[in-house]
Amino acid sequence: MLFCDDSKKYLKEQNINLKNEFDKDDKRVEKFSLKHQNIYFDYSKNLINDYILKSLLESAEKSSLKDKIKQMFNGAKINSTEHRAVLHTALRDLSSTPLIVDGQDIRQEVTKEKQRVKELVEKVVSGRWRGFSGKKITDIVNIGIGGSDLGPKMVVRALQPYHCTDLKVHFVSNVDADSLLQALHVVDPETTLFIIASKSFSTEETLLNSISAREWLLDHYEDEKAVANHFVAISSKLDKVKEFGIDLEHCYKMWDWVGGRYSLWSSIGMSIAFAIGYDNFEKLLAGAYSVDKHFKETEFSKNIPVIMALLASYYSCTYNSQSQALLPYDERLCYFVDYLQQADMESNGKSVNIAGETVNYQTGVVLWGGVGTNGQHAFHQLLHQGNIFIPVDFIAIATSHHNYDNHQQALLANCFAQSQALMFGQSYDMVYNELLKSGLNETQAKELAAHKVIPGNRPSTTILLDELSPYSLGALIALYEHKIFVQGVLWDINSYDQWGVELGKKLGKNILKAMNDDSSDEYQNLDDSTRQLIAKVKNK
């Protein structure tokens, strides 16, 4: 059954008024909220009632969602265009039941690789791994891009209070040399360990940064043997890793059944373990696993990722929402939006269904946002008074890691106030009367009142965590991962390929050749606009 059918449009005719819904139903919050361990999920401020939710859940039941969930967890190749299983969940699975993919029990492989990463982390932290000059490693530089950067960087920042190893962890991603230089300016070649995170070991940005880092190291040591003491790799291309000068004992696996944007649970998360210690890294995995079990075993009406996906898909299909705002009210989550942008938009930014047919309904949306309270002084104006339909997710943490309780209370008060303001707004009469009370005369009040009206009735969800710990962060990430999966099923698209990024890479290589040789075929085949841009650069 197609989720985005005409029946969803009729649901909009329920004309939900949130204020009225709360006034007439004192059980609304109880009905439209869920709890998973230390995560409270309040979706009562969404444009739904019992009838709409029942209809959405029926659509989920009639879809292939239950079967697709089983297929994913059992290792079926649901990434149909690349003929791959989708098993990032296996990386955090604490069960011992065999899981066979292409004739091999991958649980054994995963366990073995985890042990290798653990041994490396403990070796570096303890000082048993030394730089070429014999000095202890003090800094880790992770060189990667996309999923090899966004996830680990987000987690390392979010869990800063749990840093316990005395290692400073840096991230380099952009091909712009400034990204690399920012790291190199603050590290010592004798005490730095580089992680090259690239499945193909040929990703342009990662390879160029790695080569430059290698040159920087050798400028200091003037001995090729130094590379083995200062570089490890996460890749499936052993020949290229060896050619670079890295000992193959220090090359860690990336499997085809783990997509880059879901890879922080794998060896790609090595930089996380270097920062927070391997025991805390395992707690991150355990938190995600708890949500995997919740997602796999819980009926849809009480299943948080399913409800998240149904609401988002409903707004997309029925209200034509083209974006979603994600507003974490915690500075530690300052990279969370960046991370989820890739996870969501690269997964569901598709225009054909599984069969390769162009769809006639909207799929992925633009996910954007930023940390509170900063956003209140930047883009919240659009959320409150703009005429674009934008559902909002608020993420709040009940307790902080610091002792500034007055700061934390103010932060949470602002978060809850924003969701309340989106829901209730303020009417013309309310504003007009307030202006009269403030001392304005009737003419002045009438002139200003229309500008201060806030329509309200704008949907939001609040996700409240007891604390931001490795365990709870793992759970939070997994909630959104599974939400993305469910939306892909509802829209009948493949959430696990990303063919849209390939053309730009191909053209970028051609243009680079053209920039270096204006007699080349690549230059001759350029359009006039691109040729002029190249000319402008060369003339500077």
Curated annotation (Swiss-Prot):
Listed GO biological process terms: gluconeogenesis; glucose 6-phosphate metabolic process; glycolytic process
InterPro entries in the cross-refs: G6P_Isomerase, G6P_Isomerase_C, Phosphoglucose_isomerase_CS, SIS_dom_sf, SIS_PGI_1, SIS_PGI_2
GO function terms (MF aspect): carbohydrate derivative binding; glucose-6-phosphate isomerase activity; monosaccharide binding
Keywords (A to Z) from UniProt: Cytoplasm, Gluconeogenesis, Glycolysis, Isomerase
UniProt enzyme class: isomerase
Active-site residue list: E346 (proton donor), H377, K505
The EC number(s) this enzyme carries: 5.3.1.9
Pathway(s) where this gene product acts: Carbohydrate biosynthesis; gluconeogenesis; Carbohydrate degradation; glycolysis; D-glyceraldehyde 3-phosphate and glycerone phosphate from D-glucose: step 2/4
Keyword Isomerase: yes
Record localization: Cytoplasm
Catalytic activity, as annotated: alpha-D-glucose 6-phosphate = beta-D-fructose 6-phosphate
One of the record's GO cellular component terms: cytosol
HAMAP family assigned to the protein according to its UniProt record, in alphabetical order: G6P_isomerase (MF_00473)
Function noted in UniProt: Catalyzes the reversible isomerization of glucose-6-phosphate to fructose-6-phosphate.
Family under the similarity heading: Belongs to the GPI family.
PANTHER family per UniProt: GLUCOSE-6-PHOSPHATE ISOMERASE (PTHR11469:SF1)
Protein name: Glucose-6-phosphate isomerase
Source organism (scientific name): Francisella tularensis subsp. tularensis (strain SCHU S4 / Schu 4)
